[in-house]
Amino acid sequence: MLQKNLLKEWWVWVIALMGLILWLSSCTKPETTLYVCKAGQHDFKPSPVPFPFAAKTLTGWALLDSSCWYNDLGEDTQDWNKLAGVYRWADVVKNKNSFILAWRPDPMRNVFQLCLYENIDGANRPHESAIYKVNANQGFSFWFAESNGEYILFVDGTFLGEQDNDKPFKTIGKISAWFGGNQTAPHDMSLQMDF
């Protein structure tokens, strides 16, 4: 029901159209930061301090390096890694109520799956019905479109999903890249991102 209401809103279509225009017209890579996760760690560094701010629409650009692909974690290979997102600042912790763009390796070498991933009252809720695939070293843009404390997610202009959580996100903090799931990074990984 929320999706039907959101898709009737003019601002959703304006943001989607702006995103499509930006994506089609982008000829150069934006200024990015290199994030590195060392083998045996979870956190990609540098790890920015998540200062609180009022909920708003956020845009970003990322590129997953071929070093991010792996297939040696057994059943944990299917866990979702976090790329970027927002969380409710009032909850203090990032994994209680959050709205995230997540990634994992595809079975095909050097291909990655992207999806919307939520934490709702501490429960993990990946939206696996809408998977977007990118190749290693292929840049992509993403948009966290916000209205009245609710978010929807687009990647390269493709709608990936909307917020299922009924708690409004009024004051938020940013979530940055994180490996896992249960396991830590099996080897050094790097990605580029502007968020």
Predicted regions and their residues:
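Flexible glycan-contacting loops in extracellular carbohydrate-active proteins
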Residues: 163-195
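Short tryptophan-centered beta-strand motifs in secreted/extracellular beta-sheet-rich domains
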Residues: 138-146, 151-153
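Short, aromatic/His-centered strand-loop micro-motif at the edge of beta-sheets
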Residues: 115-141
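Secretory/extracellular carbohydrate-interaction modules
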Residues: 32-114
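Short strand-turn-strand beta-turns centered on an Asx-Gly dipeptide
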Residues: 154-158
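Bacterial Sec-dependent N-terminal signal peptides
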Residues: 2, 21-42
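Sec-dependent bacterial lipoprotein signal peptides
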Residues: 1-25
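Surface-exposed coil/turn segments at beta-strand junctions on protein surfaces, enriched
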Residues: 51-53, 133-137, 168-170, 184
